[in-house]
Regions:
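Shared catalytic-loop signature of beta/alpha-barrel
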Residues: 1-63
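Extended hydrophobic packing segments that form well-structured cores
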Residues: 64-93
Length: 93
């Protein structure tokens, strides 16, 4: 099998999905991300994604293993007008 390295440019929900994919894929190589899911990305989860010595520790909770803190989500609505999907340093208007 060819090894896979899922690339992640989204937040912690997609991160949790990639972690679950990685744990059940025998040809998984590395989990690639542009973020560490800290700050707001940790606050929006009731239990943040856990890291130890550079490794993600998969959740033992059911499903994706995460639960959103909806109070945090409501307190931080998305108000921007652009979606940053490129490797540019600044958001695109």
């Amino acid at each position: 099998y060819a090894q896979i390295a899922p690339h992640l440019y989204c937040g912690p929900v997609v991160g949790a999905a990639n972690i679950q994919l990685a744990t059940c894929t025998p040809n998984f190589l590395i989990l690639e991300s542009i973020q560490k899911w800290d700050g707001f990305q940790a606050e929006i989860l009731k239990t943040p994604i856990e890291w130890q010595d550079g490794y993600v520790i998969p959740s033992i909770e059911p499903g994706l293993g995460i639960e959103l803190d909806e109070d945090v989500a409501r307190a931080n609505p998305y108000t921007d007008t652009a979606l940053h999907l490129t490797m540019d340093l600044d958001p695109i208007d």
